[in-house]
Each structure stands twice: as C-alpha cells, then as structure tokens.
Amino acid sequence: MPIRYPNGQPYSRSPKQGQAKKPLPADTYSGRGMTLEQDIDEANLYYLSQQRAVVHKKPTPVQIVKVDYPKRSAAVIREAYFKQASTTDYNGVYRGAYIDFEAKETKNKTSFPLKNIHPHQVDHMREVSKHGGICFVLIRFFQSAEVFLLDAKHLIDYYDNQDVRKSIKKTEIERLGHQVKTGLHPPIDYLRTLDAVYFNGDAKERT
C-alpha cells in the first residue's frame, strides 16, 4: 500500500529500531548523519529507560484514500496520505510538568528561517504556554551540529514580527536560548537544559 506525504511524495520508512548504526566520525560524539528527530527519539528512549521522563513523538495523522474489502470481515488500505500535523512534534511529562516542543533543523549557518514553523504550531505553543506548560523549540544548525533550546515566548515574538525579519539570527538564538549538550547517551541531553532553565538547576520546584 503506497503511503504518501501531503505533497504527494512517497513515504520511505526509516530504519527500524535495533538496526546497526553507521559508526560516528571520530571527531564528534553528536548524531552527525542522523536527523534531529532520530537523535531526540533515541534520547527519549534513554530517558524512559532511566525513569527520568516520559516523552513521545506525536503520531502523524493519515488520510485514507482507497480501501479494498477482499473479505467481508477484513479491509485492506490501498492508498493513504500523511496529513499535516496539527500541533508540535513531541509532548510528555518531566518532573511533574507537562512539556511540549517542536524540533527543527536548518542548513543555514547564520540564521533560522521562520518559514520552517507553521501558523498552527505557533497557535498551539501559545495555548500550551498560556496554560502553564513548558513549551519550546529545539533547533539544530546542521553545519556546526549545535543544538539550542529556545523558549516558545521568544519564537512567538519573532514569528509575530515577520514583517521586520523573516528569520532569527543565530546570534539571537545564542543570546535568548540555551545550547544543549550533545554526546552518546543520550545524543541530545535536553533534560539537562530544562533543569537549568525551568527548574532552577537541581531544585525540586519550577522557577
């Protein structure tokens, strides 16, 4: 059964969990060669195994186009399309708080294009923030493999002022955001950054 993205391109299944990975270059421990989402998925599995957090990627909705019924009691999907996700990529619970975030990667060296964020995602971030959830975006600059956590309020401010600038300078992300430690286990340790930004370091209570 062919499954396609909203633009009509065929869906290619990513390697199954457990398959051997290509060795990383000797000069880095970060997930070069892996997508940002793959690194986050691996980090989330690590956090779950260590009983630190429960965070999952939200499933992408699928629109079924063609269904055959070879048997009265069975249906076979012949054609389907991925629909555009209505919210952000990930959500879960950490230290008793609801967290919700988007993951974006850019090949630009000096800025992050705001066109990578969709209006419905910004609307969702507004609502999560308004109701007290921890909401942010993880941005990876592909060329340098640097990952930054930017709180939703800063992203929303820039998004609402696109008549002034269509992107966020990397220097602004460095100033307003927080660089996330990368390594082996986990490949992207964003919980460490959450501790520093939202939980006053090792404090029990949120700041």
Swiss-Prot record:
The record marks 104 as: Transition state stabilizer. One of its GO terms (cellular component) is cytoplasm. It is an enzyme of class 3 (hydrolase). Keywords: Cytoplasm, DNA damage, DNA recombination, DNA repair, Endonuclease, Hydrolase, Magnesium, Metal-binding, Nuclease. Its main location: cytoplasm. GO terms for biological process: chromosome segregation; DNA recombination; DNA repair. Binds 1 Mg(2+) ion per subunit. Endonuclease that resolves Holliday junction intermediates in genetic recombination. Cleaves mobile four-strand junctions by introducing symmetrical nicks in paired strands. Promotes annealing of linear ssDNA with homologous dsDNA. Required for DNA repair, homologous recombination and chromosome segregation. Belongs to the RecU family. NCBIfam families: PRK02234.1-5, recU. This is Holliday junction resolvase RecU. It comes from Shouchella clausii (strain KSM-K16) (Alkalihalobacillus clausii).
